[in-house]
C-alpha cells in the first residue's frame, strides 16, 4: 500500500514529506471550472530542516500510496505535529484505486515551526471496505508525484 521511506506502526504507516509549498493568503483554486493549481511558493530546506513561518502550507507525502480496491485511505497528523500546535486540515479520503504521492494541508499558527527533513509528519491508515469497490479512482490527481525523488 505504501512504497518509499516509511515506518510501520501497529495501526498505520508513518510517512515524511517530499515537497512543501507555502499557500498565498490570496489564491484561486478554480477559475472557469478548469484551473486546478494554485500559485504557491516552494519551500526549500535550510540545511537538514524545513523552517516554516506562520501561514498555510501544502505538503506532499514522501511515499507513493496505492489504495487497493478493498480499502480507503486517510492521512492523519502524528502526535508530534499536534503537540507543537500545528494544525492539519481534515484529510481528503483517498479512494479505492488512487495511486500517487498525495498532498495534505497544514497551518502553522505559531511564529515558526522547525522540523528535520527526514522526520515523519503523518500517519496513513487504511480502512477495509465491506467488499472491493467496483468503481476505482481515475480522477485528475491520479499518479501525482513530486518534482524530484524523495531521498
Task: Give residue spans per PLM region.
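DUTPase catalytic domain/fold
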Residues: 1-151
Amino acid at each position: 500500500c505504501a512504497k518509499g521511506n516509511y515506518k510501520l506502526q501497529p495501526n498505520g504507516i508513518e510517512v515524511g514529506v517530499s515537497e512543501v509549498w507555502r499557500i498565498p493568503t490570496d489564491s484561486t483554486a478554480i477559475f472557469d471550472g478548469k484551473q486546478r493549481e494554485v500559485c504557491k511558493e516552494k519551500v526549500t530546506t535550510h540545511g537538514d530542516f524545513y523552517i516554516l513561518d506562520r501561514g498555510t502550507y501544502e505538503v506532499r507525502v514522501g511515499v507513493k500510496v496505492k489504495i487497493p480496491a478493498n480499502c480507503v485511505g486517510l492521512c492523519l497528523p502524528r502526535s508530534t505535529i499536534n503537540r507543537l500546535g500545528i494544525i492539519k486540515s481534515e484529510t481528503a479520503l483517498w479512494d479505492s484505486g488512487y495511486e500517487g504521492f498525495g498532498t495534505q494541508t497544514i497551518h502553522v499558527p505559531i511564529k515558526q515551526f522547525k522540523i528535520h527533513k527526514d522526520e515523519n509528519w503523518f500517519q496513513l491508515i487504511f480502512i477495509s471496505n465491506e467488499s472491493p469497490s467496483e468503481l476505482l479512482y481515475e480522477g485528475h490527481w491520479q499518479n501525482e508525484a513530486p518534482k524530484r525523488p524523495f531521498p
